Amino acid sequence: MTFSLELSEEQQELRDWVHGFAEQTIRPAAREWDEREETPWPIIQEAAKIGLYGFETLATFWADDTGLSLPIANEELFWGDGGIGMAIFGTTLAVAGIFAAGTPDQLAEWVPQCYGDVDDPKVAAFCSSEPGAGSDVSAMRTRAVYDEAKDEWVLNGQKAWATNGGIANVHVVQAVVDPELGSRGQAAFVVPPGTKGLESPSKIKKHGLRASHTADVFLDDVRVPGSCLLGGKEKLDERLARSREGTKASSQAAMKTFELSRPAVGAQAVGIARAAYETALEYAQQRETFGRPIIENQSIAFTLADMRMEIDAARLLVWRAAWLGRNGGFTAGEGSMSKLKAGRVATWATERAIQILGGNGYTREFPVERMHRDAKIYDIFEGTEQIQQLVVARAISGKHIA
């Protein structure tokens, strides 16, 4: 398939549909839910009612051979608000984990339970990071031990910074099954609703994305059926055997999930950056000093020109990465490039927007201060800025740069 910048009619309709929901439903509620620092369940339910939140829509996104539907939708969703956008999108991280490693039967069983239904929507959590294992996935300490007599896996450990952790209907947990193999000795498990031993005492108070629930998750002798091992035990045993023999094994589920999500996450940052740019542009056209709109001053106009240029460049990198992910794969760390660039642009553009608004930009009466707080996380999660640079550096050099 040829890469094209011309959106299909269906993609344009998708963009307009999500934009309409973001403009009419998300934006008017953004400040309230940011200040409440609570999951916006009424908005999630509204998204479910129109079909925006649910597996059917996500499946439609993933069925797009161009790979662009999810980034297009994400940009509009997060243009509405980063925190509410993540409250709606967060479940996708867990679903991506199930898709990366699960069997068709597991997908059919667990993905619908991640979303619930229109009358009773649910959320799901992907639990990979730990207090001592963020960027360094090989440092993971959560263990999964197989109880052959009962055909159950017993999970013990602590997960950190889990989106929807504790409030999720379904938790997808990454754990070590063979410590001697490092990151190659890991597997992913579904923890069903109501499983004993999974606790999340409190949520984490965050700098930004406050409408999205983030928490540590504790696993104390959590027992799950053997069928909850994503991919199944036979496949796991084969992979572990290849690793012990020193032959190449496929990437673990956590890394597959990150690979699937980076262009989509980059699109979120583009949406936040665009929202800040548009706010600053409108303000600069209306705000007058010294008898004229401030946009007529070169310093302001040039800043806005740079903002528009950088946002468009970031979007193009995101679209290229999304397309490559579906058509041939990455050769030079393009997925990491897209997220790295988009994250940098988001933090820079939101800061510039505050500067253009001056004192008003520093207050909560205007949305750019919230956008700035929301943007910072894109330099950190789903792979820090430095890890993204490392991925690209290794890809272009062919060397294992530490």
Give short role names for the model-derived ranges:
Residues M1-G80, I84, D117, P121, ...:
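Alpha-helical interface subdomain recognition
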Residues D81-A96, V118-S129, Q158-H171:
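FAD-binding core of FAD-dependent oxidoreductases
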Residues G85-L107, G134-D136, Y146:
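N-terminal glycine-rich flavin-associated loop
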Residues A100-E130, E148-D151:
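FAD-binding glycine-rich core of flavoenzymes that anchor FAD
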Residues G132-S135, W161-N164, D178-E180, K206-H213:
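Short Gly/Pro-enriched turn/cap motifs at secondary-structure boundaries
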Residues E152-S200:
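A short core secondary-structure module
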Residues K196-P225, L229:
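Flexible, small-/acidic-enriched active-site or ligand-binding loops
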Residues D221-Q252:
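Long, acidic (Asp/Glu-rich), low-complexity accessory segments flanking structured domains
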